[in-house]
């Protein structure tokens, strides 16, 4: 069991900042506490960036602290403007209800039997006059506008609706502290201003000191957010990002980002990580395979991780060096294969498909009218056991 969680988070490059760091360190060592992590259900799945916070919540839970997970079923109706240039898409309430239901299942999958709240339970009880009178007096608009949470939107035209987001999230912390003795909020580093707003509200209304802790965002070595794919994000739901595509994302990760990803997302010993990340040339493939397997296992379980690993090796190992062909999306598959002389005739192509003798990335082609779909990764078209064609799709 960990004895010094803050030190561990720093060693694993998870720690960004905390208010009253020394006091928080003692607070977590001296007794078991209630803490909370929040997620707005703006999609029907969590993504890999969210998993960083789940990972930290699990570490604290294993130390004996009690997690309270807050799903923003009310705040999702407004949308967090933090770091955004454009106004968020306004979601229908029925969509948020559906998203909340699926995310609850994911939370339980990763954290087990934990306390899950929906903030509409308390936020819907507030009336507007009460918000302005009882909460608004504790917020300086000048200070709010100076934070990173609003600066990007300010240039484009910040709405009153968005301005209220910080107040409502601060009230979440206030409510949980008052009713559940929650003394710590954990969020991504982009949530620092919102977390401090909640801590300050509690201090001014209740004269109590609470803590905020932020985690580093999961980014590549070049600063780009990790997890961007052709589907928009690296989703934890296999129906949105297949287990194979999830596995392959880590296989294709740039070499410079490997060590940080190992540290942030796995519990592998640091010495082992150093050894793996010091491998050079073709041997670095072993490092990527280890990373891909460990993270896929965390999210999807050992069985599916092994299946993805085996499929990846089957598709990509021992292949001859082939030219990568650029293909426009929406191209008819049979027409393309005949044009490139990969298959002699359309009749042969139809026969291969009917006999399940043609695959794309190890998936049988079953539709005689199949078109070539856009994929971020390379696609390996296999005819029989030994004939391959490697393609990369480009938008028409």
Swiss-Prot record:
E.C. no: 6.1.1.1
Motif ('KMSKS' region): 225-229
Gene3D superfamilies in the record: HUPs, RNA-binding S4 domain, Tyrosyl-Transfer RNA Synthetase
Keywords linked to the UniProt accession: Aminoacyl-tRNA synthetase, ATP-binding, Cytoplasm, Ligase, Nucleotide-binding, Protein biosynthesis, RNA-binding
Main location: cytoplasm
Pfam families given in the database record: SYY_C-terminal (PF22421), tRNA-synt_1b (PF00579)
PROSITE patterns, alphabetized: AA_TRNA_LIGASE_I, S4
UniProt family annotation: Belongs to the class-I aminoacyl-tRNA synthetase family. TyrS type 1 subfamily.
Protein task: Catalyzes the attachment of tyrosine to tRNA(Tyr) in a two-step reaction: tyrosine is first activated by ATP to form Tyr-AMP and then transferred to the acceptor end of tRNA(Tyr).
Quaternary structure annotation from Swiss-Prot or TrEMBL: Homodimer.
Stated name of the protein: Tyrosine--tRNA ligase
Organism encoding this protein: Mycoplasma genitalium (strain ATCC 33530 / DSM 19775 / NCTC 10195 / G37)
Gene responsible for this protein: tyrS
């Amino acid at each position: 069991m960990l004895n010094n969680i803050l030190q561990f988070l720093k060693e694993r490059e998870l720690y960004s900042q905390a208010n009253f760091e020394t006091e928080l360190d003692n607070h977590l060592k001296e007794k078991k506490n209630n803490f909370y992590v929040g997620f707005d259900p703006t999609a029907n799945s969590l993504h890999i960036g969210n998993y960083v916070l789940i990972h930290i919540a699990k570490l604290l839970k294993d130390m004996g602290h009690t997690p309270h997970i807050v799903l923003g079923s009310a705040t999702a109706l407004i949308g967090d403007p933090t770091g955004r240039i454009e106004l968020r898409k306004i979601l229908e309430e029925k969509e948020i209800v559906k998203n909340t239901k699926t995310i609850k299942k994911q939370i339980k999958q990763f954290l087990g039997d934990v306390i899950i709240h929906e903030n509409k339970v308390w936020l819907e009880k507030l009336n507007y006059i009460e918000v302005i009178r009882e909460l608004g007096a504790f917020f300086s608009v000048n200070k709010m506008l100076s934070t990173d949470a609003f600066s990007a939107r300010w240039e484009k035209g910040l709405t009153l609706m968005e301005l209220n987001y910080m107040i409502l999230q601060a009230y979440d912390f206030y409510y949980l502290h008052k009713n559940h003795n929650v003394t710590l909020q954990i969020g991504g580093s982009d949530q620092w201003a919102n977390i401090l707003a909640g801590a300050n509200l509690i201090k001014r209304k209740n004269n109590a000191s609470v803590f905020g802790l932020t985690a580093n965002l999961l980014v590549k070595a070049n600063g780009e957010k990790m997890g961007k794919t052709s589907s928009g994000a690296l989703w934890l739901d296999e129906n949105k990002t297949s287990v194979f595509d999830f596995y392959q994302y880590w296989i294709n990760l740039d070499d410079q980002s490997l060590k940080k990803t190992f540290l942030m997302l796995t519990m592998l010993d640091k010495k082992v990580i150093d050894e793996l990340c010091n491998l050079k040339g073709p041997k670095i493939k072993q490092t990527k395979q280890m990373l891909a397997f460990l993270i896929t296992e965390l999210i999807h379980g050992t069985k599916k991780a092994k299946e993805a690993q085996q499929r990846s090796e089957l598709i990509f190992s021992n292949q001859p060096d082939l030219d990568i062909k650029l293909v426009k999306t929406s191209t008819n598959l049979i027409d393309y294969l005949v044009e490139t002389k990969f298959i002699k005739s359309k009749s042969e192509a139809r026969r291969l498909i009917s006999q399940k003798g043609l695959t794309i990335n190890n998936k049988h082609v079953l539709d005689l009218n199949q078109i070539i779909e856009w994929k971020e990764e390379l696609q390996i078209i296999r005819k029989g056991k030994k004939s391959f064609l490697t393609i990369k799709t480009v938008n028409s």
